[in-house]
Amino acid sequence: MKLAVIVFPGSNCDADLLWAVKEVMGIDAEFVRHDATSLAKFDGVLLPGGFSYGDYLRCGAIARFSPIINEVIRFATEGKMVFGTCNGFQILTEIGLLPGTLLRNDSLRFICKSVPLKVNTHTKFTSEYPENVSIHLPVAHGEGNYYCDEKTLKELKEKNQIVFTYQEKVNGSLANIAGICNEQGNVLGMMPHPERAMEELLGSTDGRSFFASIIKNFGKELSQ
């Protein structure tokens, strides 16, 4: 299994993401620039956090026009794994791979802290977490307030697409949503950073089971 970590102008969590999957989890991975046009040698895509293109207009609005995005969309439509954290989540909503949008935090302040999360373990991204587990992951964002219309929220609930839920008030997100997946289950976006919770020295290892789930479920599909 080989993963691509996409690097946009303004990305600042790309190194964290590469370190987490490659050095800690032992997954083959490498950086891919935003202006690349092929992901032919990769099996999955990771969109990192940061401030792509300075977050001008709105978060992810300019990144959606990067040449690599066409390949990311192709990956998703072919059922391959696509994951976006923080700014990566914002980009996934901008390009239409995930429903809804991310608004300014209701406090109008940047939030940087560890938050408790409820995990839906019945997804390919979370199957290695114990049932009914509560985990802690860092967040660091100014625009993480998830919003969608009532019809979309109803569908997210009915189709088991809400993957991570805040267990306390964090940013005003509708239904306390912290992360969602697409209906097919191969695309996930979340505001918290699992790549920053990989070592006890950093305060938590709760992110490891997230990447272990990716290895088990998406890696298994490649070997079949």
UniProtKB/Swiss-Prot annotation:
Coiled coil feature spans: none
Subcellular locations according to the entry: Cytoplasm
InterPro entries cross-referenced by the UniProt entry: Class_I_gatase-like (IPR029062), PRibForGlyAmidine_synth_PurQ (IPR010075)
UniProt GO BP: 'de novo' IMP biosynthetic process
Key word Nucleotide-binding present: yes
Catalytic residues identified in the record: 86 (nucleophile), 193, 195
GO cellular component, one term: cytoplasm
Domain Glutamine amidotransferase type-1: residue ranges: 3-224
Catalytic activity as recorded in UniProt: N(2)-formyl-N(1)-(5-phospho-beta-D-ribosyl)glycinamide + L-glutamine + ATP + H2O = 2-formamido-N(1)-(5-O-phospho-beta-D-ribosyl)acetamidine + L-glutamate + ADP + phosphate + H(+); L-glutamine + H2O = L-glutamate + NH4(+)
EC number(s) reported in the record: 6.3.5.3, 3.5.1.2
GO molecular function, one term: glutaminase activity
Entries under SMART domains matching the protein: GATase_5
PROSITE patterns named in the record: GATASE_TYPE_1
Domain of life: Bacteria
Keywords from the UniProt entry: ATP-binding, Cytoplasm, Glutamine amidotransferase, Hydrolase, Ligase, Nucleotide-binding, Purine biosynthesis
Pathway the protein acts in: Purine metabolism; IMP biosynthesis via de novo pathway; 5-amino-1-(5-phospho-D-ribosyl)imidazole from N(2)-formyl-N(1)-(5-phospho-D-ribosyl)glycinamide: step 1/2
Complex formation: Part of the FGAM synthase complex composed of 1 PurL, 1 PurQ and 2 PurS subunits.
Protein role: Part of the phosphoribosylformylglycinamidine synthase complex involved in the purines biosynthetic pathway. Catalyzes the ATP-dependent conversion of formylglycinamide ribonucleotide (FGAR) and glutamine to yield formylglycinamidine ribonucleotide (FGAM) and glutamate. The FGAM synthase complex is composed of three subunits. PurQ produces an ammonia molecule by converting glutamine to glutamate. PurL transfers the ammonia molecule to FGAR to form FGAM in an ATP-dependent manner.
Name of this protein: Phosphoribosylformylglycinamidine synthase subunit PurQ
Species per Swiss-Prot/TrEMBL record: Enterococcus faecalis (strain ATCC 700802 / V583)
